[in-house]
Amino acid sequence: MNESPDPTDLAGVIIELGPNDSPQTSEFKGATEEAPAKESPHTSEFKGAARVSPISESVLARLSKFEVEDAENVASYDSKIKKIVHSIVSSFAFGLFGVFLVLLDVTLILADLIFTDSKLYIPLEYRSISLAIALFFLMDVLLRVFVERRQQYFSDLFNILDTAIIVILLLVDVVYIFFDIKLLRNIPRWTHLLRLLRLIILLRIFHLFHQKRQLEKLIRRRVSENKRRYTRDGFDLDLTYVTERIIAMSFPSSGRQSFYRNPIKEVVRFLDKKHRNHYRVYNLCSERAYDPKHFHNRVVRIMIDDHNVPTLHQMVVFTKEVNEWMAQDLENIVAIHCKGGTDRTGTMVCAFLIASEICSTAKESLYYFGERRTDKTHSEKFQGVKTPSQKRYVAYFAQVKHLYNWNLPPRRILFIKHFIIYSIPRYVRDLKIQIEMEKKVVFSTISLGKCSVLDNITTDKILIDVFDGLPLYDDVKVQFFYSNLPTYYDNCSFYFWLHTSFIENNRLYLPKNELDNLHKQKARRIYPSDFAVEILFGEKMTSSDVVAGSD
């Protein structure tokens, strides 16, 4: 079994906690590696706390089972020659060239019809070009049959029709080249045949439509990169069976977006054919939707912003709801999607893998999802959960399942006393921090009188004292803005999510690779390797503040 393509992405969640361990310990693994001791005085408390556990045999066995099935699906590419041919016929350039040839062929035929009516004839060279184009597409069909196998290729009705049209048009071109059409027109019984030939020529328009369809498939494959696709039984969808009953896929689209994403009609056809009356679709996008009637009103929408996390409450409700749906019938399945079908989808799928005890730890679930979603036959690029906060929330949910019996933890109300930013670049100016809770901005450093900033030049460290004892609880988002640094997702320099119930010792330390946006390759050149953010909290201890977690 190959390792996950991007193991560093799992750094924040590979700690397996025992019943007596703190649920927050996993968040500090990176601190022991990244932060200098003199800059993070509490780091030493967490050294040695991390215990890396191997992936369980049951998870590896489940992955191996899927690998055998996937190997059967790609058995047609088992030789070097077939791999080379497949890479050629499935390339974007090859598909674009095919569309160009069809347009050229249609142009020649229209010219032929116009000049024929004028008692003139297209030169033999032009007709030879048309014949060469027909031979090219015949070769294209033969190569695709060679790669995909005859039974699979001709399981698609459009492929059957296109092949028939190519053969007919090839015969028409042969007739035009090797017979004297002018002589045949003087024979009355051939008149109707010639008219029929002209009509058959117009079938090239259908061939153009089919080539456009092939080009759309190539564009969708390019957009989905090396995400594992479903390419059986005439389907070609950005869709992966994570387990036999859990499907992860990209957004079912219509209109122009269906040109490069899963067409919603094809997704409906797939689910109705494979799991009729036994599927439920979960749309995790807050930014886009579709008419649930497409899926017979079996759609549940969970509002999660792109590149952000679900609330812990949403994760608990989702996993319990899916578990109940699965228990109703052994044939019931769920199809889960966001926009691309990796980060938000992966976060929720990983939560259910833990809830259903397919995986026992956050590390296992993240590894498992990444292995299933990534098609390594095309590229080693990791297609699992990559955003640090999303991985952090999978780790939170693992504690919810194991330490809190699948219920929300008791609510902790905290307030921020200090922000400490380590190894800040010297050219950085105009720092702004913004805190959101329950979709509302509850704090901003731009407000006068709420904080003071101390810039320590000798240690490249910024200390921000917060005067406003604003109570924070449950899911909290912290954003950082620099006026002279690039902005990425969420229109900020970087950000992260935390849940107050999992903060230990009133301290949270996050190195660069656990800050959202800064985990991206393009941000690594700007921020030093030991860049980090630390937050020191105080706690509200009054009886009115200590309340149970929301349900």
UniProtKB/Swiss-Prot annotation:
It is a multi-pass membrane protein. Residues 1-47 are annotated as: Disordered. Its EC number is 3.1.3.48. It is found in: Membrane. It catalyses: O-phospho-L-tyrosyl-[protein] + H2O = L-tyrosyl-[protein] + phosphate. Exclusively expressed in testis. GO terms for cellular component: cytosol; membrane. Gene3D superfamilies: 2.60.40.1110, Protein tyrosine phosphatase superfamily (3.90.190.10), Voltage-gated potassium channels. Chain C (1.20.120.350). InterPro entries: C2_domain_sf (IPR035892), Dual-spec_lipid-protein_phosph (IPR051281), Ion_trans_dom (IPR005821), Prot-tyrosine_phosphatase-like (IPR029021), PTP_VSP_TPTE (IPR045102), Tensin_C2-dom (IPR014020), Tensin_phosphatase (IPR029023), Tyr_Pase_AS (IPR016130). The active site is at residue 338. The keyword Chaperone does not apply. Disulfide bonds: none annotated. Keywords: Hydrolase, Membrane, Protein phosphatase, Transmembrane, Transmembrane helix. Residues 228-404 form the Phosphatase tensin-type domain. Could be involved in signal transduction. This is Putative tyrosine-protein phosphatase TPTE. It comes from Homo sapiens (Human). The gene is TPTE.
